[in-house]
Amino acid sequence: MKFYLVLAFLTLCAVAVTALPAGDETRIDLETLEEDLRLVDGAQVTGELKRDKRVTCNIGEWVCVAHCNSKSKKSGYCSRGVCYCTN
């Protein structure tokens, strides 16, 4: 029992030592990341953004039924890729 306690303590110490900051290298990476993020502008985003209401119908109708059952509904059906729950 004492062996496992010492082993757990040594593992904890090893994890703590390896989790220490690396130094200036990480700060430089963060500075370049901030510069890259400043370069991105909302106007630069091209294309139309599309949000799927439910991905469950793309997988299968039984997933839609399971989703509706988990919401305490009687059943559910898919229409044009959207899951509708019925009472």
Swiss-Prot record:
<dbReference type="InterPro" id="IPR036574">
    <property type="entry name" value="Scorpion_toxin-like_sf"/>
</dbReference>
<dbReference type="GO" id="GO:0045087">
    <property type="term" value="P:innate immune response"/>
</dbReference>
<keyword id="KW-1015">Disulfide bond</keyword>
<feature type="disulfide bond">
    <location>
        <begin position="57"/>
        <end position="78"/>
    </location>
</feature>
<feature type="propeptide">
    <location>
        <begin position="20"/>
        <end position="44"/>
    </location>
</feature>
<feature type="disulfide bond">
    <location>
        <begin position="68"/>
        <end position="85"/>
    </location>
</feature>
<keyword id="KW-0732">Signal</keyword>
<dbReference type="GO" id="GO:0050829">
    <property type="term" value="P:defense response to Gram-negative bacterium"/>
</dbReference>
<dbReference type="Pfam" id="PF01097">
    <property type="entry name" value="Defensin_2"/>
</dbReference>
<keyword id="KW-0044">Antibiotic</keyword>
<comment type="similarity">
    <text>Belongs to the invertebrate defensin family. Type 1 subfamily.</text>
</comment>
<comment type="function">
    <text>Antibacterial peptide mostly active against Gram-positive and Gram negative bacteria.</text>
</comment>
<feature type="signal peptide">
    <location>
        <begin position="1"/>
        <end position="19"/>
    </location>
</feature>
<keyword id="KW-0964">Secreted</keyword>
<dbReference type="GO" id="GO:0050830">
    <property type="term" value="P:defense response to Gram-positive bacterium"/>
</dbReference>
<keyword id="KW-0929">Antimicrobial</keyword>
<protein>
    <recommendedName>
        <fullName>Defensin-A</fullName>
    </recommendedName>
</protein>
<feature type="disulfide bond">
    <location>
        <begin position="64"/>
        <end position="83"/>
    </location>
</feature>
<keyword id="KW-0211">Defensin</keyword>
<keyword id="KW-0391">Immunity</keyword>
<keyword id="KW-0399">Innate immunity</keyword>
<dbReference type="GO" id="GO:0005576">
    <property type="term" value="C:extracellular region"/>
</dbReference>
<dbReference type="GO" id="GO:0019731">
    <property type="term" value="P:antibacterial humoral response"/>
</dbReference>
<dbReference type="InterPro" id="IPR001542">
    <property type="entry name" value="Defensin_invertebrate/fungal"/>
</dbReference>
